[in-house]
Swiss-Prot record:
Swiss-Prot/TrEMBL GO biological process terms: L-histidine biosynthetic process
Keyword Cell inner membrane found: no
GO molecular function, one term: imidazoleglycerol-phosphate dehydratase activity
Name of protein: Imidazoleglycerol-phosphate dehydratase
PANTHER family (alphabetical): IMIDAZOLEGLYCEROL-PHOSPHATE DEHYDRATASE, IMIDAZOLEGLYCEROL-PHOSPHATE DEHYDRATASE HIS7
Organism: Marinomonas sp. (strain MWYL1)
Leading EC class: lyase
Domain of life, source organism: Bacteria
Gene: hisB
Length: 197
């Protein structure tokens, strides 16, 4: 399998974002977005997905974090789409259950080429660490539309908003790792009966 790396820049009147990823990394993480709780969540993706992430974002945070969070999802999705390449030889599907104390979340992903998001996370509070939890949906919509994946996010139980969010992002990282692993029995083959994804 060729090197699965990508660097993408997005520059608008609202944000300037640069994302570099290595899908076959060790979980190295360097991230400055100006949104500390989001940085904390993205670190979970890197560590649990064994994906090297280097992210630098400057956004119009004097308004709120909406544009920064959404555009980061878009840019990260674009980077994944490039790094994954033609998808030959990958497992394609990934899933993970992750607990953290009272919270339990399940994430299932399909590198299907068809963007779709089902997010069912009944957050206990509207914000955590100064972060508006509504923005998680904006992040994941940006990601799925540009990574071209189908993503199901379910928080099955939880009372602590931080724990709910953290289990989602840890499970997201682990599901990515599973889906993107090389399948030795499918080496060089497309993981679809259609012959393309």
């Amino acid at each position: 399998m060729a090197d699965r790396i990508a660097s993408v820049e997005r520059n608008t009147l609202e944000t300037q974002i640069k994302v570099s990823i290595n899908l076959d990394g060790t979980g190295k993480f360097n991230c400055v977005t100006g949104v500390p709780f989001l940085d904390h969540m993205l670190e979970q993706v890197a560590r649990h997905g064994l994906i090297d992430l280097d992210i630098h974002a400057v956004g119009d945070l004097h308004i709120d974090a909406h544009h920064t969070v959404e555009d980061l999802g878009i840019t990260l999705g674009q980077a994944f789409d490039i790094a994954v390449g033609d998808k030959k030889g990958i497992k394609r599907y990934g899933h993970a259950y992750v607990p953290l104390d009272e919270a339990l979340s399940r994430v299932v992903i399909d590198f299907s080429g068809r963007p779709g998001l089902e997010m069912h996370v009944p957050f206990a509070r509207a914000s955590v660490g100064g972060f508006d939890v509504d923005l998680f949906s904006e992040f994941f919509h940006g990601f799925i539309n540009h990574a071209k994946v189908t993503l199901h996010l379910d928080n099955l139980r939880g009372k602590n908003t931080h724990h709910q969010a953290e289990t989602i992002f840890k499970a997201f990282g682990r599901a990515l790792r599973m889906a993107l692993e090389a399948d030795e029995r499918m080496a060089g083959q497309m993981p679809s009966t259609k012959g393309s994804l």
